[in-house]
Each structure stands twice: as structure tokens, then as C-alpha cells.
């Protein structure tokens, strides 16, 4: 292997590393954005769950609020 071949290989490796660095940065940005979205979804799910629980408990009538059956 002569110097020219080594230089070409070095250039190829540097190019691959630069491409990989750019790809890693893009992936990091995507992961960061997804984490933000996951946090928002978790908060929204928490709110919906709380509302659902409160609406279910308000839909249940207390026994003393129930009208007696017709045979009473």
C-alpha cells in the first residue's frame, strides 16, 4: 500500500466519520423531541385519567339518593 492509497483511505474514513457525526446529531435531536412529546402525552394522559375517574365517581349515585323501587 503506497502513500496515495493510504491518503484515499484516510479521506474515506474522515468522510464516513463526518457523516456519522451528522447522523448522530440528527438522531439526538429526534430523540430529544420525542422525549418532549412523551412528556406531554404523559401529562395529557394523567389529566384525562383524572377526569375519567372523577366523572365515573360522579355518575355513581349514593344509595340514599336512589329512588326506591316501585313495590315500596
Curated annotation (Swiss-Prot):
Classification of source organism: Bacteria, Pseudomonadati, Pseudomonadota, Gammaproteobacteria, Enterobacterales
Annotated protein name in UniProt: Protein SlyX
Superkingdom per UniProt: Bacteria
Organism field: Proteus mirabilis (strain HI4320)
Chain segments carrying region Disordered: 53-72
InterPro entries: SlyX
Stored Pfam families: SlyX
UniProt-listed HAMAP family: SlyX
Similarity comment: family membership: Belongs to the SlyX family.
Amino acid at each position: 500500500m503506497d502513500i496515495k492509497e493510504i491518503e484515499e483511505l484516510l479521506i474515506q474514513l474522515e468522510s464516513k466519520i463526518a457523516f456519522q457525526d451528522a447522523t448522530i446529531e440528527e438522531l439526538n435531536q429526534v430523540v430529544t423531541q420525542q422525549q418532549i412529546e412523551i412528556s406531554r402525552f404523559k401529562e395529557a394522559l394523567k389529566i384525562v385519567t383524572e377526569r375519567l375517574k372523577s366523572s365515573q365517581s360522579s355518575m355513581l349515585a349514593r344509595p340514599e339518593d336512589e329512588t326506591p323501587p316501585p313495590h315500596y
